[in-house]
């Protein structure tokens, strides 16, 4: 798969280059996707339980980098950062898709909305990567999450308040109806061999808790931007200002 080529093939190539040019520090941005549908508040000690090729290849790449570090542990530093879902200005990932649906008034809340979603603002992730350059030798593994977590009701309400000055969530539909629509979409995908924007797995992911913890606080790192500030900056940049000519980035 493309993930095998990029994550596993990329890890092999990077380790070869590090060997060739005597580079002793590697920072790898992995993902909390290695944990799959993890229990709430899963930390760095959580067991790998990935459910797709993205999570699998991120985890297998981690093992490749660990093997590289193990060859010369007294001199080599490996930093593995496992971010949760990342958002920010110009980022075209899953959070942007949600923001865009709400902005275009095409969003329906499925389920109670009481499930929590850990998120990470891109500026903070970049700041932590820079901060980690000073870590010593060894293997350093961190989840990256900006706290406190929003539940879906609060997240959607905050977005609608900023975009429409409305202090509500909008239309809700029960979970069983949402899942039924997802299974119908799965069947249509099989019949017509064409991926649809909705699926049972996407609805399950949307309505499940995706809440992680991190030991980053122990490293002394302080995020430069709060989660709510990052969300407000992103909404303003994407929907309240004219930034159509600015660069955009497509991510998983």
Language model regions located:
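Conserved Rossmann-fold NAD(P)-dependent oxidoreductase catalytic core, especially the SDR/UDP-sugar
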Residues: 12-54
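Substrate-positioning beta->alpha
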Residues: 13, 91-97, 110-133, 140, ...
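Active-site beta-alpha turn of Rossmann-fold NAD(P)-dependent dehydrogenases/reductases
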Residues: 27-31, 82-84, 145
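Flexible, glycine-rich beta-alpha linker
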Residues: 35-36, 76-97
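Active-site Tyr-X1-5-Lys
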Residues: 51-79
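Mid/C-terminal beta-alpha module of Rossmann-like enzyme folds, strongest
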Residues: 132-197, 225-235, 242-252
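Active-site loop of classical SDR/Rossmann-like NAD(P)-dependent oxidoreductases
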Residues: 152, 197-214
């Amino acid at each position: 798969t493309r993930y095998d080529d990029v994550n596993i093939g990329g890890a092999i190539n990077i380790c070869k280059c590090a060997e060739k040019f005597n580079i002793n520090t590697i920072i790898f941005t992995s993902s909390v996707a290695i944990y799959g549908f993890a229990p709430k508040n899963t930390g760095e000690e959580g067991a790998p339980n990935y459910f797709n090729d993205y999570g699998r290849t991120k985890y297998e790449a981690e093992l490749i980098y660990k093997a590289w570090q193990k060859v010369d542990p007294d001199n080599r530093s490996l930093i593995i950062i496992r971010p949760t879902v990342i958002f920010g200005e110009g980022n075209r990932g899953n959070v942007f898709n949600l923001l865009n649906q709400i902005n275009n008034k095409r969003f329906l809340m499925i389920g109670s909305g009481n499930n929590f979603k850990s998120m990470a603002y891109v500026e903070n992730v970049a700041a932590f990567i820079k901060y980690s350059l000073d870590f010593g030798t060894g293997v350093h593994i961190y989840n990256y999450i900006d706290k406190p977590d929003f539940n879906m009701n609060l997240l959607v309400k905050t977005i609608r308040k900023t975009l429409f000055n409305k202090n509500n969530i909008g239309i809700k539909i029960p979970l069983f109806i949402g899942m039924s629509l997802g299974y119908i979409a799965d069947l249509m995908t099989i019949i017509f061999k064409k991926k649809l924007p909705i699926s049972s797995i996407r609805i399950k992911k949307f309505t499940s808790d995706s809440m992680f913890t991190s030991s980053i606080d122990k490293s002394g790192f302080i995020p430069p931007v709060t989660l709510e500030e990052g969300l407000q900056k992103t909404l303003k940049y994407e929907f309240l200002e004219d930034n159509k000519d600015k660069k955009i980035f497509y991510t998983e």
